[in-house]
Protein backbone atom coordinates (compact mmCIF):
# COMPACT_ATOMS: atom_id res chain seq x y z
CA UNK A 1 0.00 0.00 0.00
CA UNK A 2 2.91 2.40 0.77
CA UNK A 3 4.07 2.32 -2.87
CA UNK A 4 0.70 3.55 -4.13
CA UNK A 5 0.22 6.41 -1.64
CA UNK A 6 -0.23 9.65 -3.63
CA UNK A 7 1.91 11.65 -1.16
CA UNK A 8 4.99 9.55 -1.87
CA UNK A 9 7.24 10.38 -4.82
CA UNK A 10 7.82 6.75 -5.80
CA UNK A 11 5.65 5.69 -8.74
CA UNK A 12 4.24 9.16 -9.33
CA UNK A 13 5.19 11.64 -12.02
CA UNK A 14 6.70 14.99 -11.12
CA UNK A 15 3.58 16.91 -12.14
CA UNK A 16 1.31 14.57 -10.20
CA UNK A 17 3.57 14.86 -7.16
CA UNK A 18 3.45 18.68 -7.30
CA UNK A 19 -0.31 18.73 -7.77
CA UNK A 20 -0.75 16.40 -4.82
CA UNK A 21 1.35 18.71 -2.63
CA UNK A 22 -0.07 22.05 -3.75
CA UNK A 23 0.97 24.13 -0.74
CA UNK A 24 4.55 22.82 -0.81
CA UNK A 25 4.65 23.48 -4.56
CA UNK A 26 3.40 27.05 -4.06
CA UNK A 27 6.15 27.66 -1.48
CA UNK A 28 8.71 26.09 -3.83
CA UNK A 29 7.71 28.46 -6.65
CA UNK A 30 7.75 31.50 -4.35
CA UNK A 31 11.19 30.49 -3.07
CA UNK A 32 12.52 30.13 -6.60
CA UNK A 33 11.14 33.61 -7.37
CA UNK A 34 12.83 34.91 -4.20
CA UNK A 35 16.16 33.44 -5.32
CA UNK A 36 15.70 34.98 -8.78
CA UNK A 37 14.90 38.46 -7.44
CA UNK A 38 17.65 38.30 -4.80
CA UNK A 39 20.23 37.33 -7.43
CA UNK A 40 19.21 40.25 -9.65
CA UNK A 41 19.60 42.59 -6.67
CA UNK A 42 23.04 41.28 -5.69
CA UNK A 43 24.13 41.23 -9.35
CA UNK A 44 22.41 44.32 -10.84
CA UNK A 45 22.51 43.15 -14.45
CA UNK A 46 19.46 45.27 -15.34
CA UNK A 47 20.70 48.48 -13.70
CA UNK A 48 20.74 49.94 -10.18
CA UNK A 49 17.19 51.30 -10.35
CA UNK A 50 15.80 47.88 -11.27
CA UNK A 51 17.96 46.28 -8.57
CA UNK A 52 16.12 48.26 -5.87
CA UNK A 53 12.77 46.98 -7.14
CA UNK A 54 14.07 43.39 -7.17
CA UNK A 55 15.11 43.91 -3.53
CA UNK A 56 11.51 44.68 -2.60
CA UNK A 57 10.15 41.85 -4.73
CA UNK A 58 12.49 39.37 -3.04
CA UNK A 59 11.34 40.43 0.42
CA UNK A 60 7.67 40.40 -0.58
CA UNK A 61 8.06 36.92 -2.07
CA UNK A 62 9.80 35.79 1.11
CA UNK A 63 6.95 37.26 3.17
CA UNK A 64 4.48 35.24 1.08
CA UNK A 65 6.52 32.06 1.56
CA UNK A 66 6.77 32.67 5.31
CA UNK A 67 3.02 33.29 5.57
CA UNK A 68 2.27 30.07 3.68
CA UNK A 69 4.69 28.11 5.85
CA UNK A 70 3.21 29.61 9.01
CA UNK A 71 -0.27 28.62 7.82
CA UNK A 72 1.03 25.11 7.16
CA UNK A 73 2.50 24.88 10.66
CA UNK A 74 -0.50 26.54 12.39
CA UNK A 75 -3.51 26.01 10.11
CA UNK A 76 -6.19 27.04 12.62
CA UNK A 77 -5.88 30.80 13.11
CA UNK A 78 -7.14 32.20 16.40
CA UNK A 79 -7.22 35.81 17.54
CA UNK A 80 -5.73 35.07 20.95
CA UNK A 81 -2.60 35.66 22.97
CA UNK A 82 -1.89 31.91 23.12
CA UNK A 83 -1.96 31.61 19.32
CA UNK A 84 0.33 34.65 18.94
CA UNK A 85 2.77 33.17 21.46
CA UNK A 86 2.76 29.90 19.52
CA UNK A 87 3.26 31.72 16.21
CA UNK A 88 6.26 33.63 17.58
CA UNK A 89 7.99 30.31 18.22
CA UNK A 90 7.91 29.47 14.50
CA UNK A 91 10.89 30.35 12.28
CA UNK A 92 8.47 31.23 9.48
CA UNK A 93 6.94 33.93 11.69
CA UNK A 94 10.42 35.30 12.39
CA UNK A 95 11.14 35.73 8.69
CA UNK A 96 7.72 37.14 7.97
CA UNK A 97 8.61 39.85 10.50
CA UNK A 98 12.09 40.15 8.97
CA UNK A 99 10.65 40.77 5.51
CA UNK A 100 8.29 43.44 6.84
CA UNK A 101 11.17 45.18 8.64
CA UNK A 102 13.28 45.62 5.51
CA UNK A 103 10.79 45.69 2.62
CA UNK A 104 10.39 49.49 2.70
CA UNK A 105 13.85 50.35 4.01
CA UNK A 106 16.95 51.46 2.15
CA UNK A 107 18.28 48.40 0.22
CA UNK A 108 21.05 46.68 2.18
CA UNK A 109 22.92 43.79 0.58
CA UNK A 110 23.53 42.13 3.95
CA UNK A 111 19.79 41.93 4.62
CA UNK A 112 19.06 40.00 1.41
CA UNK A 113 21.51 37.13 2.06
CA UNK A 114 19.43 35.34 4.75
CA UNK A 115 16.36 35.54 2.48
CA UNK A 116 18.32 34.33 -0.55
CA UNK A 117 20.09 31.46 1.21
CA UNK A 118 17.10 30.15 3.18
CA UNK A 119 15.02 30.17 -0.01
CA UNK A 120 17.81 28.41 -1.88
CA UNK A 121 18.19 25.67 0.75
CA UNK A 122 14.46 24.98 1.03
CA UNK A 123 13.94 25.14 -2.73
CA UNK A 124 16.81 22.68 -3.21
CA UNK A 125 15.22 20.23 -0.76
CA UNK A 126 11.88 20.28 -2.59
CA UNK A 127 13.58 20.15 -6.00
CA UNK A 128 15.19 16.86 -4.97
CA UNK A 129 11.75 15.49 -4.11
CA UNK A 130 10.44 16.57 -7.52
CA UNK A 131 13.41 14.90 -9.22
CA UNK A 132 12.79 11.72 -7.23
CA UNK A 133 9.20 11.79 -8.45
CA UNK A 134 10.43 12.23 -12.01
CA UNK A 135 12.83 9.30 -11.71
CA UNK A 136 15.75 8.26 -9.53
CA UNK A 137 18.29 8.90 -12.31
CA UNK A 138 16.81 12.09 -13.77
CA UNK A 139 18.99 15.19 -14.29
CA UNK A 140 22.19 13.91 -12.62
CA UNK A 141 24.03 17.26 -13.05
CA UNK A 142 21.32 19.14 -11.15
CA UNK A 143 21.31 16.43 -8.49
CA UNK A 144 25.06 16.92 -8.06
CA UNK A 145 24.59 20.66 -7.49
CA UNK A 146 21.80 20.01 -4.98
CA UNK A 147 23.97 17.48 -3.14
CA UNK A 148 26.77 20.06 -2.82
CA UNK A 149 24.28 22.54 -1.37
CA UNK A 150 23.13 19.92 1.12
CA UNK A 151 26.74 19.12 2.07
CA UNK A 152 27.45 22.79 2.84
CA UNK A 153 24.16 23.40 4.64
CA UNK A 154 25.71 23.90 8.09
CA UNK A 155 28.21 26.46 6.79
CA UNK A 156 25.40 28.29 4.97
CA UNK A 157 23.27 28.37 8.13
CA UNK A 158 26.22 29.76 10.11
CA UNK A 159 26.70 32.47 7.48
CA UNK A 160 23.00 33.34 7.73
CA UNK A 161 23.30 33.59 11.53
CA UNK A 162 26.31 35.87 11.11
CA UNK A 163 24.25 38.16 8.88
CA UNK A 164 21.39 38.16 11.39
CA UNK A 165 23.72 39.25 14.20
CA UNK A 166 25.66 41.96 12.37
CA UNK A 167 22.50 43.46 10.91
CA UNK A 168 21.73 44.70 14.44
CA UNK A 169 24.56 47.30 14.48
CA UNK A 170 23.86 47.92 10.78
CA UNK A 171 20.31 49.07 11.56
CA UNK A 172 21.69 51.47 14.19
CA UNK A 173 24.21 52.81 11.68
CA UNK A 174 21.43 53.24 9.10
CA UNK A 175 19.43 55.24 11.65
CA UNK A 176 22.27 57.69 12.30
CA UNK A 177 23.10 57.96 8.60
CA UNK A 178 19.51 58.92 7.79
CA UNK A 179 18.75 55.71 5.84
CA UNK A 180 16.70 53.95 8.50
CA UNK A 181 13.69 54.63 10.69
CA UNK A 182 13.67 55.22 14.43
CA UNK A 183 11.69 52.04 15.11
CA UNK A 184 13.74 49.73 12.88
CA UNK A 185 16.55 48.93 15.39
CA UNK A 186 14.00 48.18 18.14
CA UNK A 187 11.87 45.93 15.93
CA UNK A 188 14.98 44.21 14.59
CA UNK A 189 16.18 43.62 18.16
CA UNK A 190 12.89 41.81 18.77
CA UNK A 191 13.51 39.70 15.66
CA UNK A 192 17.02 38.88 16.87
CA UNK A 193 15.75 37.74 20.27
CA UNK A 194 13.32 35.43 18.48
CA UNK A 195 16.15 33.98 16.40
CA UNK A 196 18.28 33.57 19.54
CA UNK A 197 15.46 31.60 21.18
CA UNK A 198 14.64 29.52 18.09
CA UNK A 199 13.92 25.87 18.89
CA UNK A 200 14.62 24.54 15.38
CA UNK A 201 17.58 26.72 14.41
CA UNK A 202 20.20 27.18 17.17
CA UNK A 203 22.86 28.69 14.89
CA UNK A 204 22.26 32.31 15.95
CA UNK A 205 22.53 31.41 19.63
CA UNK A 206 25.59 29.22 19.05
CA UNK A 207 27.34 31.93 17.04
CA UNK A 208 26.76 34.49 19.80
CA UNK A 209 28.49 32.10 22.22
CA UNK A 210 31.35 31.45 19.80
CA UNK A 211 31.89 35.17 19.23
CA UNK A 212 31.94 35.81 22.98
CA UNK A 213 34.56 33.08 23.51
CA UNK A 214 36.74 34.41 20.68
CA UNK A 215 36.57 38.02 21.94
CA UNK A 216 37.31 36.96 25.53
CA UNK A 217 40.29 34.92 24.34
CA UNK A 218 41.72 37.90 22.43
CA UNK A 219 41.22 40.55 25.13
CA UNK A 220 42.75 38.37 27.85
CA UNK A 221 46.10 38.39 26.10
CA UNK A 222 48.76 40.55 27.85
CA UNK A 223 49.25 42.61 24.69
CA UNK A 224 45.62 43.84 24.78
CA UNK A 225 45.34 47.41 26.17
CA UNK A 226 43.49 47.64 29.48
CA UNK A 227 40.87 50.12 28.26
CA UNK A 228 40.06 47.86 25.27
CA UNK A 229 39.68 44.86 27.57
CA UNK A 230 37.44 46.80 29.93
CA UNK A 231 35.31 48.14 27.07
CA UNK A 232 34.89 44.66 25.56
CA UNK A 233 33.98 43.08 28.90
CA UNK A 234 31.38 45.79 29.54
CA UNK A 235 29.97 45.27 26.04
CA UNK A 236 29.78 41.50 26.56
CA UNK A 237 28.01 42.00 29.90
CA UNK A 238 25.54 44.44 28.31
CA UNK A 239 24.74 42.11 25.40
CA UNK A 240 24.38 39.15 27.78
CA UNK A 241 21.79 41.09 29.80
CA UNK A 242 19.82 41.76 26.61
CA UNK A 243 19.83 38.09 25.61
CA UNK A 244 16.53 36.29 26.31
CA UNK A 245 16.35 33.29 28.61
CA UNK A 246 16.26 30.03 26.67
CA UNK A 247 14.47 27.08 28.21
UniProtKB/Swiss-Prot annotation:
InterPro entries in UniProt: PER33/POM33_regulator, TMEM33/Pom33
Main location: endoplasmic reticulum
Keyword Repressor found: no
Gene Ontology cellular component list: endoplasmic reticulum; endoplasmic reticulum membrane; melanosome; nuclear envelope
Biological processes, Gene Ontology terms: endoplasmic reticulum tubular network organization; innate immune response; membrane organization; positive regulation of IRE1-mediated unfolded protein response; positive regulation of PERK-mediated unfolded protein response; regulation of endoplasmic reticulum tubular network organization; response to endoplasmic reticulum stress
Modified residues (N-acetylalanine): 2
Subcellular location as annotated: Endoplasmic reticulum membrane; Melanosome; Nucleus envelope
Highest taxon above the source species: Eukaryota
Tissue: Highly expressed in the liver and significantly in brain, lungs and kidneys.
TM segment ranges: 32-52, 101-121, 156-176
Sorted UniProt keywords: Acetylation, Endoplasmic reticulum, Immunity, Innate immunity, Membrane, Nucleus, Transmembrane, Transmembrane helix
Ranges of the Cytoplasmic topological domain: 53-100, 177-247
Membrane topology: Multi-pass membrane protein
Residues exposed to the Lumenal side: 2-31, 122-155
Assigned protein family: Belongs to the PER33/POM33 family.
Subunit-level organization: Interacts with EIF2AK3. Interacts with ARL6IP1, isoform RTN1-A of RTN1, isoform RTN2-B of RTN2, isoform 3 of RTN3 and isoform 3 of RTN4. Interacts with RNF5. Interacts with RNF26. Interacts with PKD2.
Function: Acts as a regulator of the tubular endoplasmic reticulum (ER) network by modulating intracellular calcium homeostasis. Mechanistically, stimulates PKD2 calcium-dependent activity. Suppresses the RTN3/4-induced formation of the ER tubules. Positively regulates PERK-mediated and IRE1-mediated unfolded protein response signaling. Plays an essential role in VEGF-mediated release of Ca(2+) from ER stores during angiogenesis. Also plays a role in the modulation of innate immune signaling through the cGAS-STING pathway by interacting with RNF26.
Name this polypeptide is given: Transmembrane protein 33
Organism: Rattus norvegicus
Amino acid sequence: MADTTPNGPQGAGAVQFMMTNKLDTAMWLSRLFTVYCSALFVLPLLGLHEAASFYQRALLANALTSALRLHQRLPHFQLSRAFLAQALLEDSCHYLLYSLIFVNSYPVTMSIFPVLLFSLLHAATYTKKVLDAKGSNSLPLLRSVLDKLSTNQQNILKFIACNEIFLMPATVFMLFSGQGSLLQPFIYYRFLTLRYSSRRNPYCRNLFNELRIVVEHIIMKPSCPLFVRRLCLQSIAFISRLAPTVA
